[in-house]
Amino acid sequence: ARVQALKPTDAIDASYRRDLLEAFEDSGATLPAAQRERVKAIREELDKIGLAFQKRVNEDGTTVAMSVADLKGLPASWLKDRQRDAQGHVRVGLDYPSYIPFMQNAVSEDARHRLWLAAQNQGGVENIERLDRAVALRREMAAIYGVPDFASFTLKRRMAGTPANVQEFLARVRGAVEAGEKREMTELRADKAKMLGKPVEQVKLERWDVAFHQERIQRERYQIDQEGLRAYFPTEASVAYALRVAQQLYGIEFVPAKVATWHDDVRYYDVFDLKDGQRGDFLGGVYLDLFPRDGKYNHAAAFGVAPASKLTGQRPTSALVTNFNRQGLNHEELE
């Protein structure tokens, strides 16, 4: 009521007032008490499901046993220090530095297929059950708000507006890229046929073939070897260079500092404004968590750790989480 009573003085105030009122409405503040409590319970359960889902993926230690024949095509730098089981097989995990190079370089289609299947099933049946439960909860919440589905509820405050608009946009994108996609898939299929010595008509391009034949074509046509590039971009030197570029580009300075971290691999920097070569105001802090390990988030992302506050003068802190190869970076990782 207090927000509704406010009279905006300009367009910015009006927009902010509208956003606040819509946020209250979406939180369930205008619903009858029983429905409001149910929405609260649904949101809490969805949060728990999301955390449990990601935790299960992070802690999934699935590995696939690969024989010497399965490893044909993998560079020596990748094979170095790989763990082997009692039968002498290399255990290949699903972390990025293991999975991506394997899918790009392993000559054996069967080996790529087995690793791809393991990746598709990461998290197991438990996570499928969690997804089913999340879908049901979202459907229930949409019904409480009187909209046909959760997509409609999510999009109503966003630029797209409706699921129909999203589908129309995706159809336009599909129309723009479809011809190019068909050309590329035809090219990859032809490369597979060439490698197998079979007519193209007898060859089917599978999902686990795509990265391998893309890499093969790059090597043959452009002499680009993603794994070979790692020797030219050592990880530590590349990270240090990226920080220097950021310093020059944004007029800031990264200063290493010793603080408590959640793992020995994690490093922390204070970030300062830099004026005329002189260190200025403290702007915030950033953690770098660069390398894979068991139980860690297995993608790349930037997370907020602590927000800024004008009231207390607190500066923001964030964390950059990646899963880089310790031996060096390829072109995609360097980007």
Spell out what each predicted region is.
Residues 1-9:
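Long, charged all-alpha helical bundle/coiled-coil segments in cytosolic proteins
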Residues 123-130, 239, 331-335:
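Structured ligand/cofactor/substrate-binding pocket environments in proteins
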Residues 103-119:
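Short, charge-rich amphipathic alpha-helices with coiled-coil/heptad character
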Residues 28-42, 121-153, 164:
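A conserved hydrophobic secondary-structure block that centers on an alpha-helix together
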Residues 24-28, 98-102, 119-124, 154-166, ...:
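Second-shell loop/turn segments in exported
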Residues 103-105, 297-299, 330-334:
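Short conserved micro-motifs at the rims of enzyme active sites and ligand-binding pockets
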